UniProtKB/Swiss-Prot annotation:
Function (record text): Specifically methylates the N7 position of a guanine in 16S rRNA.
Protein name listed in UniProt: Ribosomal RNA small subunit methyltransferase G
UniProt binding sites for S-adenosyl-L-methionine: 78, 83, 129-130, 148
Species this chain originates from: Streptococcus equi subsp. zooepidemicus (strain H70)
Gene behind this protein: rsmG
Cell compartment(s), UniProt: Cytoplasm
Length: 237
């Protein structure tokens, strides 16, 4: 997917980018490739592949109407090189984006990226989701949480749901069918007072299968969740 094909696909979906936004995506690509030589940010480095499998894939929830262009607080867990939240922020500048990542070098890249792109309303924190999820500054403070290929839903729900306001939504992006995952996560979602609202397959323009799962927080998360760092992975709910 060339940059031009990416812009056209967005335009056909009703989202025509400004020249400034196009320049932001171009700068993002160049910085990603430059920094990838120093630290491992992505295995995908060819321009057309980055635009398809990182940029387009990241903004798919916007194209499908899951996120409005409003000043909502969005938290991205384990964003790595900024996916999906930074492409979302470029497209929808009103979003207030927070990223938590466990590798400090990635946070340094994101800080530089935000500066070079001229992004405002972006915040980066180094650490584990389990620790931040018990911090009053973060717990129950977000309208949306995004996670792209982070963990199975059984684990992911414990890492993300505590951050949401009541009626806030988790948007999980996956490359494999999550039907089995959702079945395994039933108990976890019940314990966390969350409910699956939607689970939709879609295709990237090249035909690759992807899945979006939308989960809503119904009540306050019990205080014991999330458990200490590492436990959700070792002993899923």
């Amino acid at each position: 997917m060339t940059p031009q094909a990416f812009y056209l696909a967005l335009e056909q979906a009703g989202f025509a980018l400004t020249n400034h936004q196009k320049e932001q995506f171009d700068t993002y690509f160049k910085l990603l490739i430059d920094w990838n030589r120093k630290i491992n940010l992505t295995a995908i480095t060819e321009e057309n592949e980055v635009y398809l499998k990182h940029f387009y894939d990241s903004v798919a929830p916007l194209l499908q109407g899951y996120i409005p262009n409003e000043p909502l607080r969005l938290l991205d867990i384990g964003a790595g090189a900024g996916f999906p939240s930074i492409p979302m922020k470029i497209m929808f500048p009103k979003l207030d984006v927070t990223i938590i990542d466990s590798l400090n070098k990635r946070i340094q890249f994101l800080q530089l990226l935000a500066k070079e792109l001229g992004l405002e309303g972006v915040h980066f924190y180094h650490g584990r989701a389990e620790d931040f999820g018990q911090d009053k500054q973060f717990r129950g403070q977000f309208d949306l949480v995004t996670a792209r290929a982070v963990a199975r839903m059984q684990i992911l729900s414990e890492l993300t749901i505590p951050f949401l306001k009541i009626k806030g939504k988790l948007i999980a992006l996956k490359a494999q069918a999550a039907d089995q995952e959702l079945e395994e996560a039933k108990k976890a979602l019940q314990l966390l007072f969350a409910k699956v609202l939607d689970h939709q397959p879609y295709q990237l323009p090249n035909g690759d299968a992807r899945y979006i799962t939308l989960v809503e927080k119904k009540k306050e998360t019990p205080n014991k969740y999330p458990r200490k760092a590492g436990i959700p992975n070792k002993k899923p709910l």
